[in-house]
Structures are given as C-alpha cells and as structure tokens.
Amino acid sequence: MAGTEAASGSQTATISTEHTLTTITTAGVYMLRVDVNALANGDRLVLRAKAKARTGDTTRQVFSAVFEHTQADKVVDSIPVPIVHELVWTLQQTAGTGRAFPWSVLAL
C-alpha cells in the first residue's frame, strides 16, 4: 500500500517558539518530512512528535530530532510513529535566524 499525505504546509519559525504543525486523531502510522534547506550555520531546529497512551491521557513526547547548521541532506524524515488516539507534530527553532520550513506528514 502506498503512503498518502495526511497534512502539509510551511512554518516560518519564531525563535524559541514551539509551533504545532498538525494534530492527527485518525489511527495509523505517520512520518514527518521537513525541508531543511534553509538552515544555515548557527541555526538549530528541533522536531517533535507527541502522542497519548490512552484516550484521556496527556499528550507526551515520543520522538525528537535536532538539526544544527547547514545540512547535507536537505529533506529529513522522522521515524514512523504509530498512533491510536492522537499525534501532534511540532517544530521549534532554538537558535539562529527564523527560517521557513515546508513540511508534510505522510500516512504510511
């Protein structure tokens, strides 16, 4: 079965602000893809996935990845994250100049 795009957009980062890219409530396995071509030396980007263990639980971090400076790979993928209740993808730039990051969430 081929993957489909569950959500997409572009986020211009405000330094130190954690931006919510999308919240998914349909059970499945999802992966975040982000174009990091805009990163420059001195920039630091954090991508996070947060999920609930059960319906009424608090959403908590299940994955994070940090990218610093110019990247050799201009598009980066998260690990696949299976969910039943809720999945929240966030982007936070913690250093450098705020950049615009095109992104897509793929349903696998």
Language-model segments: what does each one mean?
Residues 42-55:
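Short, surface-exposed beta-strand/strand-loop-strand elements in extracellular ectodomains
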Residues 62-79:
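An anionic, turn-rich surface loop/hairpin at beta-sheet edges
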Residues 27-34, 79-101:
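Noncatalytic modules at the cell exterior or secretory-pathway interfaces
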Residues 104-108:
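Low-complexity intrinsically disordered segments
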Residues 35-37, 52:
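Acidic/polar N-terminal loop/beta-strand segments that form early-domain functional surfaces
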Residues 53-63:
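Acidic Ser/Thr/Pro-rich low-complexity disordered segments
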Residues 1-26, 38-43, 58, 71-75, ...:
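Surface-exposed ligand/attachment interfaces on beta-rich extracellular proteins
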Residues 38, 68-71, 83-88:
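Low-complexity, flexible helical/coil segments
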